[in-house]
């Protein structure tokens, strides 16, 4: 399965919520995720604090953001106010943040966390056979050997595809920023006061993605939020257009296919299950989300210099193992 693009390009809270909703609707009994903490009780405690004190935390965060603090830093201070500095420090690490959001959203399944070891989330170095996704992308773009870091089949797939370089992505972003009007870009969910205008004024002056992101970044807007904002601008994701979550099947076994068929018949799954993106009778409540998936795929194919028809979401069907 995949998380729909609208949620994949969203905040940790929305990303986690969409993922958990998909898994629980599919009947998952356990949900496993990585964290720097590796301590499920520790993560559960922070989750409980956030669930039990939403009004107090939200008011504190709003106040601190008005003072110029970023959302992540304001949230840490809000938790510190309730639990003390030691516990709140958990939210300084990116995978702990996501883990806490998973814990907040899980209703039925049993959560399990695996302690992350080796390089950090955004580290572009590798240690032995351990590397972050950022490091693998960096090494691939540098034409370095990634064999020890990936399963053999994954390496074959990556080596066949032209990597999406930051330069290509940056050029596409610049075109979008120059051609879109500020009112359109203001609708990006991760946007903020003056950010769209600053983007439009900066693209002619910046020479790389890092240069652009650093120009837009501020005490209030973190690099992570800027990266989300830029992706949302490129994909014209509109905060005012609602889409429901749905389950997009990418691959399955024959046994999995039979399970999905029984799940649909039972009515236990409340989300739409999609195996064919070209169907014209998709429910109205998910059409916008699907349209962003298709656009994201088309842009990716352009950036990878792949055949636009052959690799189109309209043409590709789920991979069935064993066939």
Language model segments and positions:
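Active-site rim/loop-helix segments in enzyme catalytic domains that contact anionic ligands
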Residues: 1
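Active-site cores that bind ATP or allylic diphosphates and position pyrophosphate for catalysis
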Residues: 4-323
């Amino acid at each position: 399965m995949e998380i729909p693009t609208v949620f994949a390009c969203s905040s940790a809270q929305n990303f986690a919520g969409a993922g958990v909703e998909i898994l629980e609707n599919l009947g998952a009994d356990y949900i496993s995720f990585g964290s720097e903490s590796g301590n499920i009780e520790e993560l559960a405690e922070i989750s409980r604090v956030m669930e039990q004190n939403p009004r107090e935390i939200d008011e504190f965060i709003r106040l601190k953001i008005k003072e110029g603090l970023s959302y992540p830093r304001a949230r840490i201070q809000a938790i510190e106010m309730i639990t003390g500095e030691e516990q709140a420090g958990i939210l300084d690490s990116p995978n702990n943040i996501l883990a806490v959001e998973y814990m907040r959203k899980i209703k039925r399944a049993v959560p399990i966390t695996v302690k992350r070891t080796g390089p950090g989330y955004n580290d572009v170095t590798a240690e032995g056979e351990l590397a972050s996704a950022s490091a693998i992308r960096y090494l691939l773009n540098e034409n370095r050997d990634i064999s020890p870091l990936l399963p053999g089949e994954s390496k074959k797939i990556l080596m066949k595809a032209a990597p999406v370089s930051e330069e290509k992505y940056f050029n596409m972003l610049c075109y979008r920023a120059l051609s879109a009007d500020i009112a359109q870009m203001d609708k990006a969910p991760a946007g903020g006061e003056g950010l769209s205008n600053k983007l439009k004024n900066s693209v002619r002056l910046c020479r790389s993605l890092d240069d652009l992101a650093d120009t837009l970044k501020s005490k209030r807007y973190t690099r992570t939020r800027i990266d989300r904002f830029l992706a949302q601008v490129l994909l014209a994701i509109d905060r005012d257009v609602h889409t429901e979550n749905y389950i997009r099947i990418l691959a399955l076994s024959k046994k999995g296919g039979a399970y999905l068929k029984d799940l649909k018949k039972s009515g236990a799954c409340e989300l739409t299950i999609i195996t064919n993106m070209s169907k014209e009778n998709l429910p109205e409540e998910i059409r916008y989300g699907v349209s962003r998936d298709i656009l994201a795929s088309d842009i990716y194919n352009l950036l990878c210099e792949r055949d636009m028809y052959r690799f189109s979401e309209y043409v590709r069907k789920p991979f069935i193992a064993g066939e």
